[in-house]
């Protein structure tokens, strides 16, 4: 079976194949840029693993309390090194991105505090976490208020509105990198960095948290490179490289991450407990592969979008 016959057996006609190849040829410059980002991110991950001397002993399974789990602890050091943060919490006990975000929010907001979302309304799954829709154990039920500043029509941050919205009760600023289910564009890391600098100039003490879901390794930098106090995401998405079967991460300042660890487990326990249950090989290998896997996904999305654009959509 030759190449054309192989595609034909999959239901791909010669006409469709030639059309796809022509689109791919036009996309070569765009793909080169995506591959350059992947190379930079791959070097970042390799450097983090070398710095923390990842070896076979870190793949050992643990059960029970998980005390002295060196594989788990070292994976967190790898994440902190790769994302240039003081600390990281990377656990299979974090079930999804929404769970990670809920931990980060509830750990760093106290009764009487305000959460201010400056990229518009967050994901639908956070509505009950915040209390926009009634739910037991929401931030609203615990006395945390919510404020929101929508993006401008062009998708940029509304800095005058952010300045007006900031007040003495504002403890945490929330930025959602991905467009989620909204028609707005995804926010670039450079734009997020500009927003972080603006907020920190007005309120150096405010905690800036970035929902980084779907954004890891898409660009050469992460929001943590521009001063985010926390970046939060899911291992089921980009950083798991398609291998992590479960898990989430929170990377940021030592103070913020410590509070998140106490919220995940219990005060006094923090990061000392949490067995890895034999998942370390998948979590290490997934993170190693993530830059390549993400670049492939981005190229696939760009290719399909270009195809449909040429077809008149």
Regions found by a protein language model. Give the residues of each.
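Flexible, glycine-rich loop/tail regions that form catalytic "lids" or insertion modules at the edges
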Residues: 40-43
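Generic structural marker for isolated residues within well-ordered, non-membrane alpha-helices
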Residues: 76
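Aromatic- and Gly/Pro-rich donor/ligand-binding loops
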Residues: 61
